[in-house]
A protein has these predicted regions:
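Active-site bordering "gate/hinge" segments
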Residues: 1-186
């Protein structure tokens, strides 16, 4: 358990439907803040109470509220919510890759690139149209191929030897981040 707290969620499913949900939190003060509030207030406040993945937290709260009051959510809305969570996950991964990793490797953070990608993810999340995740992922793969990796991402992901993951491809220059990572392989 971390200082920030822990949330355990148990779900019982029968006949394809959620029959019971059990929550255990080491942060009971959060539930006290929400007690007595309207469902709309709860959905609005939940992302403010937890620092990680605020949009996913809000969606989870909305889903829990809808289940509690017996409201049916159309498939199109569930699909849109899924895309929003995926886009937020992309943003979180980009944060780590472009800001945290360089700092750990004593390299300058990729702030400008991160800001551009963060804005693109945020804009896509607002609309969350079908295909937006696929399009953004394709563009990210292209960015990785051109900027971060010594060979195309698909080939890099197929490597199964730790040393090979850090070897430069014959015709490509290493990016600074991979050069720093290779120093750890000594």
């Amino acid at each position: 358990m971390s200082v920030a707290g822990e949330l355990s969620i148990g779900v019982r499913v029968a006949d394809g439907e959620v029959r019971a949900v059990e929550l255990a939190s080491t942060r009971p003060q959060a539930s006290r803040v929400l007690a007595g509030r309207t469902p709309a207030d709860v959905a609005r406040l939940v992302p403010m109470l937890f620092s990680l993945c605020g949009h996913a937290q809000q969606i989870a709260a909305s889903v829990a509220i809808e289940a509690a009051i017996g409201e049916h959510t159309p498939d199109s809305e569930r699909d849109k919510r899924t895309r929003r969570v995926r886009l937020e996950a992309i943003q979180e991964h980009l944060w780590r890759l472009m800001l945290d990793w360089p700092a750990l490797l004593s390299l300058p953070p990729l702030r400008d690139a991160f800001a551009r990608w963060y804005r693109r993810c945020a804009a896509a999340r607002e609309e969350a149209e079908a295909g937006c995740c696929r399009q953004l992922a394709s563009e990210l793969v292209d960015y990785c191929d051109r900027t971060l990796l010594p060979l195309p991402l698909a080939q890099w992901l197929e490597l199964d030897d730790d040393a090979a993951l850090l070897e430069p491809a014959a015709a490509r220059e290493w990016g600074p981040m991979l050069q720093a990572l290779s120093a750890f392989d000594a």
